[in-house]
Each structure stands twice: as C-alpha cells, then as structure tokens.
C-alpha cells in the first residue's frame, strides 16, 4: 500500500512553505484516535515534506496517516488536496483498513511487541527512556525499579518483557509508542521485516 505514502508526499509537496508550517502546527492539535500518540513538537517543526511523510506513516501507518492528512488539509481549507487524497484512499481500498488496521493486525499475527520480542531485547539500547515513558501508566514503581536494577540493556529488556504477559493491548500499545519515540528507525525496520 505504498500509494498512500506517495499520495501524502504529493499533497505535502504541493503546500507552500507557510502552508507546510501551518499543517505541522495543526497536526499538533488535531484530535487523534485512541491509542495513537503525537509526533513530538521539536522533531515535527524541523521536518520537510519527505521527513514528515515518513513520520506520519511510521507513527500512524499508511491508512490512518492518509486519513489524518486529509483531516488537517480540510481544517486548513485545502479541500481540493484533501479530495485528491480521498480518491487515493478509495482506490486503494483503504476505507475499511483505516478503521481496523490495528485490530486486524493484532488479531491475525499478534501485537508488534510480541512478534518482535527477541529483536527488541537485542537491539533496544535506550531502555531508561522507554521505562520513563511507561512509569506510572503501565509500570508500577516496583516494576520500574526492578527493570532499572538490571545492568545491561538486554537484561533490562528481558525483565521488562517478564511483565508483558499480564498487560492488555493498551499497555502494549504504550510500549510500542515509547519505542517509536525513542527508537523510530528500529521500529520502522522491524515493521518492514
């Protein structure tokens, strides 16, 4: 479904410099679906159209990224560009997928966190940042301290994964979101594998 990515890029490249800046500002305030986090402001404001397209797709997947781009363009009064994206969405059959991608992919193949457990244990290096993002909302103080007490990144990730069986989908989504913020290229690489 690379068509959605291409359509987002085409739309963003058609914006003037001021319009792209306005798009990014609106993206910071637009209502997001439950389970999706915001692209950090500092990173967002520095992005050009290509980087922003990649970030939209990596954060929100192609179908929801396309839908979100349409919403922001409509809010800006750029109906024609939004309609072009709508046409692409309908042609690619993304209408049904946009509403159910997270649920379908979870039901069919298991959650990203479960699928890529070994790779995450081996490749996540900034574990403390991930822990900080999960502390309080997913991890109790005791769990947080138990993971931090481990000496290597791999041991910390193993300890973190020892708590995963008791987590619900929201907890796993929170871990995925933290990983996307701290290790975006690792997550992108694993999503494509």
From Swiss-Prot:
Q: Which GO terms describe its cellular component?
A: AIM2 inflammasome complex; canonical inflammasome complex; cytoplasm; cytosol; endoplasmic reticulum; extracellular region; Golgi membrane; IkappaB kinase complex
Domain spans labelled Pyrin: 1-91
The record's tissue-specificity note reads: Expressed in small intestine, colon, thymus, spleen, brain, heart, skeletal muscle, kidney, lung and liver.
The answer to whether UniProt assigns keyword Ubl conjugation to this entry is: yes
Query: Matching PROSITE patterns, A to Z?
Result: CARD, DAPIN
Q: Where in the cell is it found?
A: Cytoplasm; Inflammasome; Endoplasmic reticulum; Mitochondrion
- Quaternary organization: Self-associates; enforced oligomerization induces apoptosis, NF-kappa-B regulation and interleukin-1 beta secretion. Homooligomers can form disk-like particles of approximately 12 nm diameter and approximately 1 nm height. Component of several inflammasomes containing one pattern recognition receptor/sensor, such as NLRP2, NLRP3, NLRP6, NLRC4, AIM2, MEFV or NOD2, and probably NLRC4 or NLRP12. Major component of the ASC pyroptosome, a 1-2 um supramolecular assembly (one per macrophage cell) which consists of oligomerized PYCARD dimers and CASP1.
MF terms from GO for this chain are:
BMP receptor binding; identical protein binding; interleukin-6 receptor binding; myosin I binding; peptidase activator activity involved in apoptotic process; protease binding; protein dimerization activity; protein homodimerization activity
What is the recorded post-translational modification?
A: Phosphorylated. 'Lys-63'-linked polyubiquitination by TRAF3 is critical for speck formation and inflammasome activation. 'Lys-63'-linked deubiquitinated by USP50; a crucial step for NLRP3-mediated inflammasome activation. 'Lys-63'-linked polyubiquitination by PELI1 is also critical for speck formation and inflammasome activation. Deubiquitinated by USP3 that cleaves 'Lys-48'-linked ubiquitin chains and strengthens its stability by blocking proteasomal degradation.
Keyword Ubl conjugation among UniProt keywords: yes
- The annotated crosslink position for Glycyl lysine isopeptide (Lys-Gly) (interchain with G-Cter in ubiquitin) is 55, 172
Gene3D superfamilies cross-referenced by the UniProt entry: Death Domain, Fas
One GO term under biological process is: negative regulation of interferon-beta production
Q: In terms of domain of life, where is this protein from?
A: Eukaryota
The CARD domain, residue ranges:
105-193
- State the organism named in the record: Mus musculus (Mouse)
Q: Name positions with the PTM Phosphoserine.
A: 193
Mind listing the UniProt keywords for this protein, alphabetically? Apoptosis, Cytoplasm, Endoplasmic reticulum, Immunity, Inflammasome, Inflammatory response, Innate immunity, Isopeptide bond, Mitochondrion, Nucleus, Phosphoprotein, Tumor suppressor, Ubl conjugation
Q: What is its main location?
A: cytoplasm
The name under which this protein is listed is Apoptosis-associated speck-like protein containing a CARD
Read off the domain note.
Answer: The CARD domain mediates interaction with CASP1 and NLRC4. The pyrin domain mediates homotypic interactions with pyrin domains of proteins such as of NLRP3, PYDC1, PYDC2 and AIM2.
Say what happens when this gene is deleted: Increased resistance to endotoxic shock and severe defects in caspase-1 activation and interleukin-1 beta and interleukin-18 production in macrophages in response to several pro-inflammatory molecules. Mutants are resitant to vaccinia virus (VACV) but not vesicular somatitis virus (VSV) infection. They show lower viral loads in the lungs compared to wild type mice, they produce higher levels of type I IFN, IL6 and RSAD2/Viperin after VCAV INFECTION.
Function statement: Functions as a key mediator in apoptosis and inflammation. Promotes caspase-mediated apoptosis involving predominantly caspase-8 and also caspase-9 in a probable cell type-specific manner. Involved in activation of the mitochondrial apoptotic pathway, promotes caspase-8-dependent proteolytic maturation of BID independently of FADD in certain cell types and also mediates mitochondrial translocation of BAX and activates BAX-dependent apoptosis coupled to activation of caspase-9, -2 and -3.
